[in-house]
């Protein structure tokens, strides 16, 4: 196979890897950590392979120094990791759990010492159980204030140490799998609720980014997105239109809001089918 190098990567390109708190940390009930919706969801029979869970995972909480040493050995330039909301606020709000905050400060310092740029994800799907039980989590606009306050604590605590932030990790995944396919918490199959949850997540994302700029945090912030392109199978105009509509429904439904603050027309037309008349003014 012939490989052609079209352009060299710049020297400051951030080669790295990423994880999520629930995927790697373990220590699910240690040092004051509260329960998340994933702690409950994995205990529902049939929801995970062989009833596996993240109670221990790879024990990153206790072995992060070894893990960072391995990252350095690999030559990573950056490491993106998420914060477990329930380590900072065990009930989703209230008093800060200092032990949880100290863990992430120690991890960040270890990364910096190893010459690895820390990149922080504020939310990677592990919503505090308390907020889900109190007001339905992402189904209530109350979460906007709670998420923003949580983010502000992290912005201030990591100021000057973390320069790259991800507000929401793959919003299209946690809204679709949580509220359309029931493969993620809270295990719902309801298009109407999915569209409403997604809109509230958009508002929360914007609120957190605005807070970041209001606090004059040095760095960059934005959401991440799980993008899968859609191509027409041939040049038939009907198939080209179908591919364009699929792009609207599966990608631009999120990306257009992030970039332009508007939903694409095709996606709005579909979502309005599933949204009852009294609800519509709140969503457009």
Which positions does each model-derived feature cover?
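Active-site region of glycoside hydrolase catalytic domains
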Residues: 2-48, 91-93, 101-276, 280
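A generic structural signal for short
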Residues: 55-56, 95-96, 197
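Aromatic- and Gly/Pro-rich amphipathic surface segment
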Residues: 35-69
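A common structural microfeature
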Residues: 12-14, 61, 78
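Short, cationic motifs built from Arg/Lys/His that form the positively charged side of catalytic pockets
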Residues: 80, 87, 277-279
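Glycine-rich, proline-tolerant flexible connector loops at the mouths of alpha/beta enzymes
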Residues: 83-96
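Catalytic domains of carbohydrate-active enzymes, especially glycoside hydrolases
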Residues: 63-84
